[in-house]
């Protein structure tokens, strides 16, 4: 089981298509964490991506990090590795949620 708002190391695979994030990188879980699902929805992160209104910049492990809401993904739980490396606080998670809603037009 994963924790909503926790940042994990995630394997996004090696498929080289367009500008999609790939390889192992950090991502925050945005799907409900209280359910033992076989898939989880995450927002990948980057320390070098270009800024955008739907890419909030927050600190993860002391480093300014952009949350790539435009690359939100649902992946198998087996691709989430290890324990959380960090946790978003309530205000940080609200910024990610707002960016998701804005990006999806909700």
Curated annotation (Swiss-Prot):
Keyword Membrane part of the UniProt annotation:
no
Q: Does the keyword tRNA-binding apply?
A: no
- One MF term in the entry's GO annotations: DNA binding
Cite the Gene3D superfamilies for this sequence: 2.30.30.110
Which family does this protein fall into?
Belongs to the PemK/MazF family.
Give the record's subunit note.
Answer: Forms a complex with cognate antitoxin Rv3098B/RVBD_3098B.
Name of this protein: Putative toxin Rv3098A/RVBD_3098A
* Source organism: Mycobacterium tuberculosis (strain ATCC 25618 / H37Rv)
């Amino acid at each position: 089981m994963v924790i909503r708002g926790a940042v994990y190391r995630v394997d996004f695979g090696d498929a080289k298509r367009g500008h999609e994030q790939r390889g192992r990188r950090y991502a925050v879980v945005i799907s409900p964490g209280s359910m033992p699902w076989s898939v989880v929805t995450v927002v990948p992160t980057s320390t070098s991506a270009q800024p955008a209104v739907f890419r909030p910049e927050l600190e993860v492990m002391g480093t300014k990090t952009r949350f790539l809401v435009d690359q939100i993904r649902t992946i198998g739980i087996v691709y989430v590795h290890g324990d959380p490396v960090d946790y978003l606080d309530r205000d940080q998670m609200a910024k990610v949620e707002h960016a998701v809603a804005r990006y999806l037009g909700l």
